[in-house]
Curated annotation (Swiss-Prot):
It comes from Pseudomonas syringae pv. tomato (strain ATCC BAA-871 / DC3000). Substrate binds at residues 22-23, 54-55, 86-87, 197-198. The gene is murI. SUPFAM superfamilies: Aspartate/glutamate racemase. The active site is at 85 (proton donor/acceptor), 196 (proton donor/acceptor). Belongs to the aspartate/glutamate racemases family. This is Glutamate racemase. Gene3D superfamilies: 3.40.50.1860. The lineage of its organism: Bacteria, Pseudomonadati, Pseudomonadota, Gammaproteobacteria, Pseudomonadales. Its EC number is 5.1.1.3. Provides the (R)-glutamate required for cell wall biosynthesis. GO terms for molecular function: glutamate racemase activity.
C-alpha cells in the first residue's frame, strides 16, 4: 500500500468522519467507547506505532507528532479530533487547539476528579506512563481535584510495548502488572486510575489480581460523551449509517492489522502513514 499524502482540507459536514489517534493500539479502547455512544459516526484511526512509546519521548517530540497527525486528519476532512492518548494530550493538545481554534477537539486526562470522589480509604492509585505522570497537566489535576486525598503514582514502563503485540494474558505481562499493582495495594488504594488508553485492555487481568473492593476508573466513556456534546453543540452529529473505520499505521501496516482482532476490532484495511 503506498503512502497516503496529506490532502487539501475539506469542508466537514455532519457525515464527515471523526479522527482518532494514539501512539499505538491503546486508543482503540476509546474507539470502542465512541462506537457505543455514537454508533452513527464514521471513524478514522491513526496508530503512530512507528514512534511508540510516547511516554518515554520528550514533550517537544510529542508536540511535533501531534501537529503532524492533526494536520493529516484536518486534510482528510475530519469534522472533529480525538487525541486518544494521555501523554499526547498532556504535551500536545493545547498546541493543536491553538492551530485549529474552531475544530472540535477532545483530549484524554487521568480521571483524578471521579477517583477522588469515589475513594473510601482516601488513597487513590494511578497507573500511567512516565510522560503523563511528569506532566504539568497532571500536576494541575492533582492540585485541583485531589487536595483532600492521598495519591500514589506508579509509572509502568514495558506495559504499552507488550499490549502493542496483542499480549494481554502472558506470564510476562502478568508478572509486570503484578509488580506495578503491589505498591498501590500496600498503600491501601481502593480506587485505581488507568491513566493510559492501553490499560483498559488489561481490566480482565487486573480483576484477577485486585480485591473486589478496588474500583478501576478510566476515561474512555467520558471522552465519548464529551465528543457527543461537542458534535451536538456544533450541529455535526451524523445521521448514519456509519461507514467502515479506516486505519493508518506509521509502522508496518500488516503488523497493526494482525493485532486488531485481539483487541475486539474488526479486521480492516490498514494504510501506511509516512509523515
Amino acid at each position: 500500500m503506498p503512502d497516503i499524502p496529506v490532502s487539501q482540507p475539506v469542508n466537514p459536514g455532519c457525515d464527515a468522519p471523526v479522527g482518532v489517534f494514539d501512539s499505538g493500539v491503546g486508543g482503540l479502547s476509546v474507539l470502542n467507547e465512541i462506537r457505543q455512544t455514537l454508533p452513527n459516526e464514521s471513524l478514522l484511526y491513526l496508530a503512530d506505532c512507528g514512534h511508540i512509546p510516547y511516554g518515554e519521548k520528550t514533550p517537544e517530540f510529542i508536540i511535533e507528532r501531534c501537529l503532524i497527525i492533526a494536520d493529516f486528519f484536518h486534510g482528510q476532512g475530519a469534522k472533529a479530533l480525538v487525541v486518544a492518548c494521555n501523554t499526547a494530550t498532556a504535551a500536545g493538545v493545547a498546541h493543536i487547539r491553538q492551530r485549529y481554534p474552531d475544530w472540535p477537539i477532545v483530549g484524554m486526562e487521568p480521571a483524578v476528579k471521579p477517583a477522588a470522589e469515589a475513594t473510601r480509604s482516601g488513597v487513590v492509585g494511578v497507573l500511567a506512563t512516565t510522560g503523563t505522570l511528569q506532566s504539568a497537566r497532571f500536576a494541575a489535576l492533582l492540585d485541583r481535584f485531589a487536595s483532600d486525598v492521598s495519591v500514589v503514582t506508579q509509572p509502568c514502563p514495558g506495559l504499552v510495548e507488550l499490549i502493542e503485540t496483542g499480549d494481554l494474558v502472558s506470564p510476562q505481562i502478568r508478572q509486570l502488572l503484578q509488580r506495578y499493582v503491589e505498591p498501590l495495594l500496600a498503600a491501601r488504594c481502593d480506587t485505581i486510575i488507568l491513566g493510559c488508553t492501553h490499560y483498559p485492555f488489561l481490566k480482565p487481568l487486573l480483576r484477577e489480581m485486585l480485591p473486589a473492593s478496588v474500583t478501576l476508573i478510566d476515561t474512555g466513556a467520558a471522552v465519548a460523551r464529551q465528543l457527543q456534546r461537542l458534535l451536538s453543540r456544533s450541529g455535526l452529529l451524523a445521521s448514519g449509517p456509519a461507514r467502515d473505520t479506516l486505519y493508518w499505521s506509521s509502522d508496518i501496516p500488516d503488523n497493526f492489522g494482525k493485532i486488531l482482532p485481539f483487541l475486539s476490532q474488526m479486521s480492516g484495511n490498514v494504510r501506511s502513514f509516512r509523515l
